[in-house]
């Protein structure tokens, strides 16, 4: 088979695998399944992104963003670093997913980090990873003020999440 055709088939396979997967797919999994190196997968993902595929690298692997059913909302919140776990649990216990965290930086502008948690287990793993890495969370760059993209299966679930964030004093409201 011609080199170009082999790559095109592999690219189609990557998109198909990501479309069908309900969970993030690691580069190592893709490499093994497609019998190529991890580096080839990294290059293929970069190429697919250049073609317009919205492939996001999360701590647990690649996901093809968009096309999900449900509602998504960008939410402004403020809290101390030690309240991260409580904030994330507040969202997942009410049926939501925290996609990312976004902070404003005076020099760099917007800085975005992928969180991608939707269960208590994932929240605990994420918080544990932050503690083990001994790194400052992004919210420390902006005095605790930050944004999250939150996804929920429906508007009713999203409203429940918003009420809970407000009740805990995390939600920044207009006015």
UniProtKB/Swiss-Prot annotation:
Keywords, in A-Z order: DNA-binding, Metal-binding, Nickel, Repressor, Transcription, Transcription regulation
Pfam families reported for this sequence: 3H, HTH_11
Gene3D superfamilies named among the record's database cross-references: 3H domain, Winged helix-like DNA-binding domain superfamily/Winged helix DNA-binding domain
Free-text remark on how the cofactor is bound: Binds 1 Ni(2+) ion per monomer; it is not certain this is the physiological metal.
Co-factor requirement: Ni(2+)
Top-rank lineage group of the source organism: Bacteria
MF term (GO), any: DNA binding
Keyword Membrane: no
Binding-site residues for Ni(2+), renumbered to this chain: 79, 87, 146, 148
Subunit structure, as described in the record: Homodimer.
Its biological purpose: Probably functions to regulate transcription of NAD metabolic genes. Binds to DNA upstream of the probable nadBII/nadA/nadC and niaRP operons in a nicotinic acid dependent fashion. Nicotinic acid may be a corepressor.
Stated name of the protein: Probable transcription repressor NiaR
Organism: Thermotoga maritima (strain ATCC 43589 / DSM 3109 / JCM 10099 / NBRC 100826 / MSB8)
